[in-house]
Design a protein with these regions (language model features):
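Active-site loop/turn elements of alpha/beta-hydrolase fold enzymes
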Residues: 60-62, 103, 158-160
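Alpha-helix N-cap and loop-to-helix initiation/capping positions
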Residues: 72-79, 128-139, 173, 177, ...
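Substrate-gating cap/lid alpha-helix
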Residues: 110-158
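Short catalytic/ligand-binding loop motif for oxyanion handling, primarily in non-cytosolic enzymes
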Residues: 15-17, 65-67, 107-111, 163-165
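Short, flexible, mixed-charge acidic loops at enzyme active sites
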Residues: 22, 110-120, 164-172
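Histidine-centered active-site loop/cap adjacent to the catalytic His
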Residues: 2, 40, 44-47, 145, ...
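Conserved SGNH/GDSL esterase-like catalytic core that processes O-acyl groups on lipids
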Residues: 1-86, 90
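A short helix->loop->beta-strand "cap" motif at the edges of active sites that frequently abuts
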Residues: 93-98, 153
Length: 200
């Protein structure tokens, strides 16, 4: 019998989400710092299936992008999609409800030096690193949303919650490194998850 809990598997964004329960269901945090989807998949049996939860939130692929050589990014993202699909089917095969979540975009590090470099980059017509990362995040997010609808999988669309009008991370929802999530960001996410994951 399922124990009624929700496991959250992901990387450091997931690891840092201080949510102990969602709608009175205990949340078991299995975020792993710096992990890519291949590493999440490798421990999925041990950290998700073996715990016999009611559902699993599968969230996070940004390290696949961070760690990839730009010249190989398309191959890497092909594998990212395969890894996410495999986690979904492993959960379903064990009677655990998979819940997919979109990745959040990033913003430049806060600081004058970063602002100046970003400005110079724009003048030179170069795509900034965060624009490159965010473009790839958006590509996979679009795939996740379509995949979720097509396969009737519940979705937590986290990206727009933390985004500014340009689709990058809003400053108030970012840690100073521009990548990790501020306490205010996590608060917004928790309220949203409670609303979205109410039992039908």
């Amino acid at each position: 019998k399922k124990n009624g809990s929700i496991v959250m598997i992901g990387a450091s964004y997931a690891e840092g989400w201080p949510v102990s329960q969602i709608n009175d269901k205990p949340v078991v945090n299995k975020g792993g710092y710096g992990e890519k989807t291949a590493e999440m998949l490798a421990r999925f049996q041990r950290d998700v299936i073996d715990l016999n939860p009611e559902s699993v939130i599968i969230w996070g692929f940004i390290n696949d992008i961070f760690d990839a050589n730009r010249s190989r990014i398309d191959t890497v993202l092909h594998q990212t999609r395969a890894n996410l699909r495999e986690m979904v089917s492993m959960a379903q095969a064990s009677g655990i409800e998979p819940i997919l979540a979109t990745e959040v975009t990033i913003r430049p590090q806060s600081g004058l030096k970063e602002a100046v470099l970003g400005f110079i980059g724009k003048l030179l017509g170069k795509q900034s690193y965060q624009d490159y990362v965010n473009q790839k995040v958006t590509t996979i997010n679009d795939w996740i949303k379509t995949y979720a609808v097509t396969n009737q999988i519940r979705l937590l669309d986290l990206q727009p919650l933390l985004a500014d009008e340009n689709g990058a991370r809003a400053k108030k929802y970012a840690a100073p490194d521009g990548s990790h999530i501020s306490p205010a960001g996590y608060n917004v996410m928790t309220r949203y998850a409670e609303h979205e994951l109410q039992s039908e």
